[in-house]
Structure formats: structure tokens, C-alpha cells
Amino acid sequence: MNTEPSSAGPEPASLQRIALSLQYDGSSFCGWQRQRNGRSVQAVLEDAIAQLDPHRPVQTFAAGRTDAGVHAAGQVVHFDCSGPIPARKWAPALNGRLPSTIRVRESVARPLDWHACYSATYRRYRYTIHNGRRPNLFLSPWSWHCYQHRLDESRMRDALSSMLGLHDFSAFMKAGSRRAHARTTVQEVLVERQGDLLRVEIQASGFLYGMVRLLMAQLVAVGEHRLSVAAFEQRWRERRRHEVKEAAPAAGLCLLRAGYAKPIFTKAGWYDSQPWFFLAESDPPTDPPSTPG
């Protein structure tokens, strides 16, 4: 990616920094980050920005680098531009050039020293599990259909709560991470059931590569009584990465939002105001009797 300033571009004083609140369906992309082989959210977004500001090389920065198949309801992205478009007009202008799988909810101006990634104080992810006996076509793109039996959300809540605070989470870091260490602060956790849907939310100062999907597979083992709460805690505290062998599917994971010292957007994320629990119904205790005739 060319990051050198264009000699034909405007003076730096004319730059404005734009922050976007972004949603996307991760199943359509190979992840956030631009890649040589594959369609990334970053590449598609940068191409759309370039159409509106063709005189300056485009480079975007995101609060979280979601992996292939992972969704976002409140991704935060920034870029610098030199054109005459007012900050608030970038959202509708980009939506007219982006595929339907990416939507910009809001666009605002930010100071040039503000950064979507480095200024963030937390990121919050949600993982959704469909814990019903029968698969649901409308939920499958957004959740993990997981049913051996009803998951014990109380045990899952106890296990997840053990992670609160600043710790080394090497056990939940995929190989290939560029981080110098595996320490991060888990600030809040939530495990909540409504009908056949379980939502698990984790808020942290930052997340390791593959962290949420690795720990979710372990958490489901706790909910299925295949792994004790104590064993779950022992695995991550003692950094037993070799015992964490599976990752939960990407479809259930969504970057809910990123937070900053002061709110920068006026509209709440879609997941905050309109959770889609209504899409699933609880399984009945038994199948209804067949009707004669």
C-alpha cells in the first residue's frame, strides 16, 4: 500500500480526519485487513473512499482487525482526506458506493492526533450461540448452532468471570500473532440467555489474535459439562495453549463496538438498540401431537 503523500496533493493544513461507524457482514470477506488474495473490508472501503477523494492516497485504520467471517456492528475506522466533502456527508456518499454487505452508520470529523485504534480504551465483542435442537436458517449466518444438550449458562458465566482483570492470556492466542506479549485487561463479561439464544459479551482493552473464538470453544465445553470451571481457569492461568485445540466458528462472532475517552458518535450501535433475539423461538419441551386427517 502506498502511504507516501502525493506531491500534487493539498498542503497538510487542508487535511481533515474522518471517523466512520461501520457495519459489515463478515461472511462476504476474508477479514478486515487488506490481503493479496481475497476480498477484504479494508480494500473495498478504501476503493470507495478513493472514488470520492482521488487526489490523495487512501489509508484506513480500524479499531479492531476482524478475521475472515467475523462480523462488525460497531467497527470504528478513520482516514484522512483533502476534498471538500463535509464530514457528515461521507456516510451517505460512501454507502452509495459500497456493497450492501458494508454500511456506514455515521461519519464525523476528528482531530488529526486522534486514532481509531490507539485512542480506543476498549473493544467489545459478542459471540452468539444458537442452542436449539433444530437449526434455524435465518440464524445460521450470525451464530454457532451448538446443541448436544442445553448449555449451562451459569457455569459458563462463572468460568468467564475468572478472566476479569489484567492477565496473560497466552492460552487463547493463535500462532502467528505479532504481539510482543499476551497481557490484556478484561473489563466486563456477560453471559445471557433468551430462549434458545445465548449471547456472550467480552469487553477488554485489547484482544489477542484469535482470542475470542478459542476461549468460546472452551466455554462451550464448560457449558456442556465436558470441562469444569476450575479446569477452564487452570488452562488459561497456567498458559496451557496445547490444551486449547479448537476454535469456535467465525459466524457467531461480532465486533460490537469500540469505546473512547469521550463518545464520538451520536447513534448507538445496532446491537445495542435492536438485538435480534426475536429471530429465534424456544424449542418446545416435546413435539406437538400430530393432527388426524
UniProtKB/Swiss-Prot annotation:
It is an enzyme of class 5 (isomerase). Gene3D superfamilies: Pseudouridine synthase I, catalytic domain, C-terminal subdomain, Pseudouridine synthase I, catalytic domain, N-terminal subdomain. Substrate binds at Y125. Keywords: Isomerase, tRNA processing. GO terms for biological process: tRNA pseudouridine synthesis. The keyword Plastid does not apply. InterPro entries: PsdUridine_synth_cat_dom_sf (IPR020103), PsdUridine_synth_TruA (IPR001406), PsdUridine_synth_TruA_a/b_dom (IPR020097), PsdUridine_synth_TruA_C (IPR020095), TruA/RsuA/RluB/E/F_N (IPR020094). The active site is at D67 (nucleophile). Its EC number is 5.4.99.12. It comes from the Bacteria. GO terms for molecular function: RNA binding; tRNA pseudouridine(38-40) synthase activity. Disulfide bonds: none annotated. It catalyses: uridine(38/39/40) in tRNA = pseudouridine(38/39/40) in tRNA. Belongs to the tRNA pseudouridine synthase TruA family. Homodimer. Formation of pseudouridine at positions 38, 39 and 40 in the anticodon stem and loop of transfer RNAs. This is tRNA pseudouridine synthase A. The gene is truA.
